[in-house]
Amino acid sequence: MTSLPCPLPGRDASKAVFPDLAPVPSVAAAYPLGLSPTTAASPNLSYSRPYGHLLSYPYTEPANPGDSYLSCQQPAALSQPLCGPAEHPQELEADSEKPRLSPEPSERRPQAPAKKLRKPRTIYSSLQLQHLNQRFQHTQYLALPERAQLAAQLGLTQTQVKIWFQNKRSKYKKLLKQNSGGQEGDFPGRTFSVSPCSPPLPSLWDLPKAGTLPTSGYGNSFGAWYQHHSSDVLASPQMM
């Protein structure tokens, strides 16, 4: 026997088998596209058509309910308070430990220059001045051993003795310069010649002895010699 293939039932066959199962029309199909039943039944249909036309496009709900408000939210950096509590106290401590910047040089006030402190002047006694003058008549410069010996004798330091000799030498040179300048100013263009009959001029080192010196101060030690020397020099031109 040969078997023939059975044809599959088509649409007509399904209608014939289930004649009572007809497709039920949907509620949305009975009304215009995009209109709800309440909108379609309202008498002011002309006013609702524009809004109904807008609803013709499919509306898709967002995946998350809060996504529709993301565009209106502020950034996270601006939403945080500016003066809120510090989250990292170690960073604040490190900033506080940084040294503060000094003001610019233009903002600094000019400071007055510091005055140099002058050392107090040494006051010499009359006995010390007498010994110092005697030694100066003998020599104007002292070696280190001589200076140390003289300082120990007089109860002074070597620096005090050194400074006294320096001041004495400068005063002595100033006196000689004034004396030579005064002679040239009184007799310009003339030179003094000493005749054989004139008394010899005292030398610069022919000073009076220390016993005849006054004890009031070393400044008067050259007073007598200066007067005697100037009188002899002035008297020599008259004897020519």
Curated annotation (Swiss-Prot):
One of the protein's GO biological processes: negative regulation of transcription by RNA polymerase II
PROSITE patterns documented for this protein: HOMEOBOX_1, HOMEOBOX_2
Tissue expr: Expressed in leukemia cells and placenta. Also expressed in kidney and fetal liver.
Entry keyword Signal: no
Primary residence: nucleus
DNA-binding segment(s): 117-176
Region (Disordered): 80-120
Gene Ontology cellular-component annotations: chromatin; nucleoplasm; nucleus
Bias-annotated ranges (Basic and acidic residues): 88-110
GO molecular-function terms, A-Z: DNA-binding transcription factor activity; DNA-binding transcription factor activity, RNA polymerase II-specific; DNA-binding transcription repressor activity, RNA polymerase II-specific; RNA polymerase II cis-regulatory region sequence-specific DNA binding; sequence-specific DNA binding; sequence-specific double-stranded DNA binding
DNA-binding keyword on record: yes
Xref: InterPro entries: Distal-less_Homeobox_TF (IPR050460), HD (IPR001356), HD_metazoa (IPR020479), Homeobox_CS (IPR017970), Homeodomain-like_sf (IPR009057), HTH_motif (IPR000047)
Keywords attached to this entry: Developmental protein, DNA-binding, Homeobox, Nucleus
Locations listed in the record: Nucleus
Family membership noted in the UniProt record: Belongs to the distal-less homeobox family.
Clinical condition linked: Non-syndromic orofacial cleft 15: A birth defect consisting of cleft lips with or without cleft palate. Cleft lips are associated with cleft palate in two-third of cases. A cleft lip can occur on one or both sides and range in severity from a simple notch in the upper lip to a complete opening in the lip extending into the floor of the nostril and involving the upper gum. OFC15 inheritance is autosomal dominant.
Job of this protein: May play a role in determining the production of hemoglobin S. May act as a repressor. During embryonic development, plays a role in palatogenesis.
UniProt name for this protein: Homeobox protein DLX-4
